[in-house]
Amino acid sequence: LWCFDPTLEQWAWMGGGQGLSWAGHYGIKGMSSPDNLPRGRGYAPAMWCDAVGDLWLFGGQSGDEYNDLWKYEMTNGSWTWMHGDSTGLSTGSYGIIGVADPSNEPPCRSEIIGT
């Protein structure tokens, strides 16, 4: 994970593996841990910040495509694996259109464009 300081116009490496091919450490779904780390990926995973400033990461690709959802807590610098598979190429589980369900899961995605 990298952080850009626009005032200094410099990057700081905040942690994580080097390169796109590190395996990551998934830990237990829903539990934050300083040992958790999403696997390396590229090809435009979706990323956004929520109202409290946490960073979210979904999908991407490095060999396989992924559908895992991660949250990075800025306050303590730890990752939480929130949803999705720890392996690539998941076909997802669609459920009923418009109905939220804990078993629903989007399939793997890469080259994601969003706002």
Model-predicted segments: where are they?
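Kelch-like beta-propeller repeat domains
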Residues: 1-115
